[in-house]
Amino acid sequence: MTRYFLAAGLLAAPAPTPPAAFYTTYSYTGYTVVDLTTGVPPTQVPGVGGTLALRADGTYDKRLSLLMGDSGPRMFAQHGRFTTTADSIVFRFTDLKGPDAQRGTYRYVAKTRRLTITLDGYPTGNKGVYELVATAPATGR
C-alpha cells in the first residue's frame, strides 16, 4: 500500500494552463531588444503598435507595427498556432521560408490583464521582450 502512495507522490502534477481571460486580443504597448553581441544596453523600440489575438483553440493572429526611423512604420503580420507549458510559449507559423517557430516565456498578470512575452533571439542569449495589455474584458468563454 505504501508503494502506491509513493508512486502517486512521484507523479508530477500537470502544468497549470492559462486562465480563460488569457485568451483574448491584446494591444502592443512596448518592445525591447536585448542584443548581447553589441555591448549596448537593451533598446526600447519606439512607435510600437498593433494587436495580438490569442485564442483558446491554440490559434493566434499577430499584427505588429514598429516605427523604423525616417522610413516610417513597418508592419508585420503573422498567423499560426501557439502552445503554452508552464511559463513557456511557442508560436508556430509558416512564412516565405517555410515552417518556423519562435520560442520563449510569458508572464500573464490577471489583475491588470497585462502580458509580457520574451522570445528567444539569435545568437543564443539575445531576446525580444514584448509588453501587451488586453484590449477588452474577457468574454468568459
Describe the predicted segments one by one.
Residues 4-12:
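Sec-dependent N-terminal signal peptides
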Residues 14-77, 85-141:
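Lipid interaction determinants
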